A protein has these predicted regions:
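Membrane-embedded alpha-helical bundles that constitute the cytochrome b-like, heme-associated redox core
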Residues: 1-226
Length: 226
């Protein structure tokens, strides 16, 4: 439930054409609260950090999580400086220009890392995308599985288009300091764009993880054969 709320809030906050300044701030506070709740609910994970072997996938997961936490802290810290509504009761703080740059960088990198985290962690979400999943499914379900695959590919393609349309790369590189809303796009379209980018990122990191796991299995078989 918390994870679903996180994903929904993150997409909504990023769809800046849909929200005005005040709703954006309050949704951002709710998003940070959901991140804290997610960390608390998964606090046992921290105990596993000192156990087990670190392979490529585990290192990648750790980097994504560490970056995501850093982005969440950066977003909230910069929001304290920039806020006019949610934290409007605070005295004016200096450094608005720097805080704005930090906020934009943390927002867009946080978005990427959040859905990279989804792709690296959630095997069940993509299980039916595998060829084996379709071949082992009952005959009546196979058309549904293939339809789901085509839908995923279509959404991912729209996500790739949206990356270009929204100038996502320049935001990630820190070349844009203000959120530029496309006022010609309807609110629903703006949400669809960010949601499709989320699907694209999750899918890419899911298959990256699958490739790394397959490579590691191949290396293990080779070492055993020797």
């Amino acid at each position: 439930m918390v994870d679903a709320a996180l994903a929904g809030l993150l997409v909504t906050v990023m769809a800046t054409a849909l929200v005005q300044e005040a709703p954006h701030e309050y949704l951002g506070v709710a998003l940070f609260a959901a991140v804290v709740a997610h960390i608390v609910l998964n606090r046992r994970w921290f105990k596993t950090l000192i156990h087990g072997r670190y392979n490529a996938v585990r290192i990648l997961r750790l980097v994504a999580i560490a970056g995501l936490v850093a982005c969440a802290v950066g977003q909230m810290a910069s929001a304290l400086v920039l806020s006019k509504f949610a934290f409007g009761f605070l005295p004016a703080l200096p450094g608005a220009a720097f805080a704005r740059r930090v906020h934009m960088l943390c927002s867009y990198w946080g978005f990427v890392l959040a859905f990279a985290h989804v792709g690296l962690q959630s095997k069940s979400l993509f299980r039916l995308m595998r060829t084996r999943g379709a071949s082992n499914a009952p005959g009546a379900l196979r058309p549904v599985i293939w339809a789901g695959r085509f839908l995923f590919v279509a959404i991912a393609c729209f996500g790739a288009y949206s990356l270009v349309k929204l100038d996502f790369g320049n935001y990630l590189l820190g070349q844009v300091q203000f959120a530029l809303a496309d006022y010609g796009a309807a609110g629903a379209l703006s949400l669809m764009r960010y949601a499709s980018i989320a699907v694209l990122i999750s899918g890419l990191f899911h298959y990256l993880r699958a490739a790394l796991e397959a490579l590691e299995k191949s290396r293990r078989r080779t070492s055993r054969a020797r």
